[in-house]
UniProtKB/Swiss-Prot annotation:
Keyword Phosphoprotein: no
A GO BP entry: keto-3-deoxy-D-manno-octulosonic acid biosynthetic process
Organism encoding this protein: Actinobacillus succinogenes (strain ATCC 55618 / DSM 22257 / CCUG 43843 / 130Z)
Pfam families for the chain: DAHP_synth_1 (PF00793)
Family classification: Belongs to the KdsA family.
Superkingdom of origin: Bacteria
UniProt cross-references to InterPro entries, sorted A to Z: Aldolase_TIM, DAHP1/KDSA, KDO8P_synthase
UniProt KW keywords: Cytoplasm, Lipopolysaccharide biosynthesis, Transferase
Protein name: 2-dehydro-3-deoxyphosphooctonate aldolase
Amino acid sequence: MTNKTVKIGNIDVANHKPFVLFGGMNVLESRDMAMQVCEKYVEVTDKLGVPYVFKASFDKANRSSIHSYRGPGMEEGLKIFQELKKTFGVKVIADVHEIYQCNPVAEVVDVIQLPAFLARQTDLVEAMARTGAVINVKKPQFLSPGQMGNIVEKIEECGNDKVILCDRGTNFGYDNLVVDMLGFGVMKKASKGCPVIFDVTHSLQCRDPFGAASGGRREQVTELARAGMAVGIAGLFLEAHPDPNNAKCDGPSALPLSALEGFVVQMKAIDELVKSFPELDTSK
């Protein structure tokens, strides 16, 4: 199988190339915090020589509770993204939830993301594809890895072949997720070699059946990330926060920002080791 390479500016995203860190915060809480988080990621990735794309949401439209914080909204969020790009020279990835958001968001950010809960919505998929932007497709928790090929086909039929796939865990009964390590290879095959990345922090989610917000297992973020990197993937999708216990969204799954450098050191070492091995054909 031939691995496809998707370019985000001068960054190559491919399963056989050095991993790309798609990292940032879950939702934009403030301009100042976004600057703080992005600055730390840039400092660490520049020091370690890891390709980097900043991630955050301007609107968490799928929060469980009507009372939960959603974000600053598209207009203010795009202003923050523009400032981050100007200040730090970073590429940016952000999700869209409505068709009307696709074009204005694609004019500012470098990658638009299709949320897991919306990945089967054909009208939204087509609108995103027609922007011509790089698209990151989150695998729905309820969808098998092999079905991701159908979503890729929808995008490609619109003339856009710049597709990245992202695993963020699979339903394991009610209110829990598990990561199928075999699924990464299945997605590569189903998509004919699209880059596959791993959203480790969202894969740590779990919840109280009657609760209004997701819980998480951030104490296990390193071990789960190590396992995903060992498969040989194009990138890691990570959320970090200066104070996870007081984050406005998904704090229980977020890596403490102070632990970022040590974490990335380990991920880079695993990625380099795995990709130094010759490919073995064990299918015969």
